[in-house]
Curated annotation (Swiss-Prot):
Organism: Granulibacter bethesdensis (strain ATCC BAA-1260 / CGDNIH1)
Compositionally biased region (Polar residues): 1-11
Molecular functions (GO terms): DNA ligase (NAD+) activity; metal ion binding
SMART domains: BRCT, LIGANc
Domain BRCT positions: 621-700
Gene: ligA
Binding of Zn(2+), residues: 424, 427, 442, 448
Keyword Transferase attributed: no
PROSITE patterns assigned: BRCT, DNA_LIGASE_N1
Protein name as catalogued: DNA ligase
Amino acid sequence: MTNPDSPSLSLTPPEALSPAEARAELERLASRIAELDDAYYRDDAPLVTDADYDALRQRNAEIERLFPDAILKNSPANRVGTAPSSAFAKIRHRVPMLSLDNVFDTEEFAEFCARARRFLNLPASPRFVAEPKIDGLSISLTYENGILTRAATRGDGMEGEDVTANVRTLRDVPQTLHGEAPAFIEIRGEVFMSKAAFLELNETQARLGQKIFANPRNAAAGSLRQLDASVTANRPLALFAYAQGESSAPVAETHWDYLTRLKDWGFVVNPLSQLIEDENAAAAFTTRIAAGRSTLPYDIDGVVFKIDDLSLQRRLGFVGRAPRWATAWKFPAEQATTVLEKIDIQVGRTGALTPVAHLQAVNVGGVLVTRATLHNEDEIARKDVREGDTVILQRAGDVIPQIVSVVLEKRPDGARPFAPLEHCPVCGSLAIRPPGEVVRRCTGGLTCEAQVVERLIHMVSRPAFDIDGLGEKSILEFHRDGLVSGPADIFRLPAREDEIARRDGWGSLSARNLSQAIEARRSIPFDRFLYALGIRRIGETNARLLARHYGSFTEWRTQMLAARQIGSDERLALGSITGIGPTIAEELVDFFAEPRNIDTLDELAGMLTITAPSGGLSSAALDSPLNGKIIVFTGTLQAMTRPEAKARAESMGAKVTDSVSKKTDFVVTGADAGSKAKKAAELGIRTLSEEEWLALAGGG
């Protein structure tokens, strides 16, 4: 298991990230999660605990929620498992074997229920089936005319490994279904090993001098994924059946009835499965199962809740890698008590000041922990955390362990409340907490050493200077070795071409190509230059708005210097620019309030030719008539609920908003459409009837 104190894990809360940092963090998370998936699903050798893995996925999901424009094509949210091993033949699942989203408490489960109700427009939550979440290996079994013909692991969710010969050796897998069954059906289940069988297997392995398994899940996965089926036959594997894939004919109208059919066909279904009538019953069931967890003969890590009505499951469908009609209520991680020795301030690459607790080393859930995130100064004040306190630590819900509470009776005399820093501990610039925000930020921007690398990477990115051959890796190397310490140094690199050519991995041709690429970017449109500065909240769209409003770099600089004066005409004008507003205006004023930012800005601008703003927006070829459009729904739709319509529109690339503005492209009007339809008419925005919407969206 890896140590969560590894510096590769960011301590910066998602809400404190800039768009550039969010993209970089999502790329790191995608790479790390893929690595962990390979280790878990393909190699049967997990590198981190389940709680740490869930926390990584939670962090990824939260960053994607806050920064939808930064979502990667290979997002872990759209991926399950890992590619099948080349040692096995591949079998494609007719119905993908997707994963489940997680909840960790009653509040999150209530929100899961509320989302389903809103999507389906139901007055109350539907009935659920609850099943203990077995910690094993998912399997798909194909039966044709009642006879087992194929068995495949989950793999990457779309394609799994052919383990048919091995599965035939499992006692819990019927070779022929008992009674009547569809001509073709896929049955899903979980292969696992009991705790007693696991201990017995490891004793045998040790006696024979063979591999010792880390836990029952690893033992089950390793036993099933044997190239020699006779090895699998001698391993004590079991299976609980729990779901259906493709079927040539309907089997049941409810999931509960389907479980009954599985038992009729000869499968073992977890006897603890239960019908659940409401959210209170779900919470009670989870509490009861968690309390008896240690007494069960097999490992579980939570409870799975599925909406019982299969017709509702079909209506709800899927989002990303998970169904909307099911969730896994994961059990909480372990807690431990330790002493908070010091509160340190970490400055993130976007200037966010994040407090970090340095702890006396303590073992939590099998991992030695020495640090924990404190998130922000409000969180410290809310929990009244002080240096010297004895604290309760928990490793659930975040990549870095969290302090849950303080043991007040053990507080030492003289322990002082935390006092927020007013200046950056790295560069000394003013640290400002904008109104309405929880994060304090360094205003050093272009000059703070903690931020400079991220700023430089952002500066050379495609929407900014777009310097070919100068990416993140080169920036990191050049900064490490002293070739680049600030933005203007980028344009001094051609003068050091010979030095770069002598570097490992470069050579004369590469160095010359880099010099030419840099020289080609000495002329840049004003809007791209603005974006390249990396000022918080100044993305591509806002950079265009500002560039078009001020017209030139010189005019913008003059106006911004004047806008530093509270109440000045220039400051009022800045906040009144359409699409900018007071929050973004404050970011610009804060940037120009730091003299070193102005010096760095002038130094960079002096090396460039900053031309007029670029023309219209660039966009990819449209895959559908809705791609890139802004849509508002109003009134009652007949063919689908509002959430279903929104999901349809978003799946085709549209953005759905709740209010009509000049930016709105279409307003879809259902029955009893109200003020939104009227406003659309006033603004001259095209309205669509439900029939026209369905035609545009590809039918009902």
